[in-house]
């Protein structure tokens, strides 16, 4: 019914709730049971909904929300009245969401495929080729790398750095085809996507190779190791964690 990746389906009193991933941001679609007419839950920011809590005899449900510059929040939504209520906001000492920004861009990989990437930093910061850049990647096993708040990223941004997270092929962000395009004989696509992310950031004056550190864990550790070996002049430092380096 929908071209976007379906994450979850829930039932409430008068509606079915479809949770989709639309260009690496959550989308809640409400299907009215009697007519199957659909409506969208309105939300101003791009981020991720999770932990949906529903009851079949109520039109009210709860969910958590986060993105790269928004610590976890819990909301109540009334599907019948189309009203949203804030229940709880996580307090992170020293962090003020309005002082930071996160935006999504699309950049071309080596074969021309457009790859989404989130770039986050302080709003009032002057960004140029001397800005420290932390580039994180995974790209495998049908795992979607979704926008979420991280104290590690906050610390990096607070010290004046840029955080960039591309959604590489091999993940589940766009469904099974996206996954298959980054596995087995197509694994090189993932390394190319990661290198192209660095090239885009350098070309657009977010940083330079000597100021760029790449990070990844497990499959992301393999990604970091392989990409650095193939394109060593793109990076100043690497942080591979528990990567399978003999593949």
Predicted segments — roles?
Residues 1-6, 10, 33-51, 80-99:
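Multi-bladed beta-propeller domains
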Residues 6-10, 14-17, 28-33, 38, ...:
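C-terminal low-complexity, glycine/proline- and small-hydrophobic-enriched intrinsically disordered tails
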């Amino acid at each position: 019914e929908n071209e976007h990746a379906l994450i979850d389906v829930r039932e409430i009193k008068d509606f079915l709730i479809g949770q989709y991933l639309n260009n690496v941001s959550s989308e809640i679609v409400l299907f009215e049971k009697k007519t199957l007419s659909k409506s969208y839950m309105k939300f101003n920011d791009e981020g991720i909904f999770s932990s949906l809590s529903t009851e079949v005899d109520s039109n009210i449900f709860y969910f958590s929300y986060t993105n790269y510059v928004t610590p976890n929040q819990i909301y109540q939504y009334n599907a019948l009245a189309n009203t949203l209520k804030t229940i709880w906001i996580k307090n992170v000492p020293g962090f003020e969401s309005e002082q930071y920004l996160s935006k999504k861009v699309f950049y071309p990989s080596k074969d021309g495929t457009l790859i989404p990437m989130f770039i986050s930093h302080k709003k009032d910061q002057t960004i140029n080729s001397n800005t420290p850049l932390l580039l994180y990647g995974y790209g495998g096993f049908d795992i979607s790398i979704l926008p979420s708040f991280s104290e590690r990223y906050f610390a990096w941004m607070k010290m004046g750095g840029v955080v960039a997270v591309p959604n590489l092929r091999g993940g589940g962000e766009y469904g099974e085809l996206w996954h298959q395009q980054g596995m087995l004989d197509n694994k090189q696509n993932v390394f190319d996507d990661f290198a192209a992310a660095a090239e885009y950031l350098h070309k657009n004056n977010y940083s330079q190779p000597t100021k760029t550190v790449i990070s990844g864990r497990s499959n992301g550790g393999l990604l970091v190791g392989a990409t650095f070996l193939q394109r060593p002049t793109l990076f100043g430092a690497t942080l591979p964690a528990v990567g399978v380096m003999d593949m």
